[in-house]
Amino acid sequence: MKTLLHICCAPCANQCIEVLRGEGVELTGFWYNPNIHPFTEYRSRRNCLREYAQTIGLPLLEHDRYELRPFVREVAADIAGRCVKCYALRLFETARTAAEEGFDSFTSSLFISPYQKHELMREAAERAAEEYGVQFLYRDFRPYFRAGQERARELGFYMQKYCGCVFSEEERYLKESKRIP
């Protein structure tokens, strides 16, 4: 089965790739993450993924345009509900690309994170699969999260501290500032 794997970052992807390859799935990575801010963060994550993909022989398709403004316009009206729109944005683009490029299915490394809203991601992926007529290959990768983080550290990957969006970064720093006396 030829599957397009949306990849948010190399640390999240390494165990997803290992699991799926272990199942005999033929993978191609897909970089599309308009939510990531600032540009230096976007570039660090993208470059880390490029190096990792090359090292493990993973073909990689890149929708490599820094699209912060369209992302912010999309989510700004409902900051609290931004994650649903962000998941949909990335998963619909992954499904569209999978259909156009002749893949049998698609999935995402987002499904490894215990910090993401898993059921909302799954619903978005299922809607995207229906719209584009390509199978959504669901896997709950969360049990592999810690092993993936450990492996990423062993490999010297760039390790980020937030999901990527400007609003998540803001929340992170606001929480930290409240702990400082």
Which stretches of residues belong to each language-model region?
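Nucleotide-activated chemistry modules centered on ATP-dependent adenylation/adenylyltransferase
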Residues: 1-181
